[in-house]
Swiss-Prot record:
Species for this entry: Nitratidesulfovibrio vulgaris (strain ATCC 29579 / DSM 644 / CCUG 34227 / NCIMB 8303 / VKM B-1760 / Hildenborough)
Subunit structure: Part of the 30S ribosomal subunit. Forms a bridge to the 50S subunit in the 70S ribosome, contacting the 23S rRNA.
Keyword Nucleus attributed: no
Functional summary from the UniProt entry: One of the primary rRNA binding proteins, it binds directly to 16S rRNA where it helps nucleate assembly of the platform of the 30S subunit by binding and bridging several RNA helices of the 16S rRNA. Forms an intersubunit bridge (bridge B4) with the 23S rRNA of the 50S subunit in the ribosome.
Gene Ontology biological-process annotations: translation
Magnesium keyword on record: no
Family that this chain belongs to: Belongs to the universal ribosomal protein uS15 family.
UniProt keywords, alphabetically: Ribonucleoprotein, Ribosomal protein, RNA-binding, rRNA-binding
GO cellular component, one term: cytosolic small ribosomal subunit
The protein, known as: Small ribosomal subunit protein uS15
Gene Ontology MF, one: rRNA binding
Gene3D superfamilies on file: 6.10.250.3130, S15/NS1, RNA-binding
Length: 89
């Protein structure tokens, strides 16, 4: 269920601002989005996995908080990230 190292590194490299950037909101939101997409695929097979569904809701809430923070700090970066990841506002 956990993302493998190569997939995680690819997501980080695609959204990092500089070498070794793992803490910026863009990278964190991108990692959470990848994890959420992975879990939604899991739920297509395992419809009654309610325990993991609560974890999914926590991840979605965490992503929402980071997006709200980014929107408050820099609207241009927020809009660019939303468009790049294909998320709704």
């Amino acid at each position: 269920m956990v993302m493998d190292i190569e997939a995680k590194k690819a997501v980080i490299d695609a959204h990092a601002k500089h070498e070794g950037d793992t803490g910026s909101p863009e990278v964190q939101v991108a990692l959470l989005t990848a994890r959420i997409e992975q879990l939604t695929g899991h739920f297509k097979v395992h419809k009654k996995d309610y325990h993991s569904r609560t974890g999914l809701l926590k991840l979605v809430g965490q992503r929402r908080k980071l997006l709200n923070y980014l929107k408050k700090k820099d609207v241009q970066r927020y809009r660019a990230l939303i468009e790049k990841l294909g998320l709704r506002k």
